[in-house]
């Protein structure tokens, strides 16, 4: 979860100064790297004298949770299949989406492309160009970041969902 928060907020903080651009994202990356280096240098956890936890016995952990891992893995595969077959499929007669994404998808795709293309922060609403966006758009800013770095709109929309699935 903290990774998603970092992907949303750190580029957003630098976007106030540099716009929602590659420069803001590179500055955000440098900020996170500096924080990690400082944490590595100055953080010294107290070592425990004795530990009752098993030491790296992953086989036993897998055996005890085999049914759960099998069900979770199968559910993730089903989620991936459904997401990839319901999200912006190019066909001969246009773009197709699944019924479950038919209503909300257009708004989110508009927000994703607006944030990446406008490179202003906070972004303007693409339907009413002189109005600031009054919607919780940071959830779409991760997809905007991926889209800004050259991914297709389809994959920029889907990739954060795969990681969000594991956070639930």
Identify the role of each PLM range.
Residues 61-82:
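Internal/C-terminal transmembrane anchor helices
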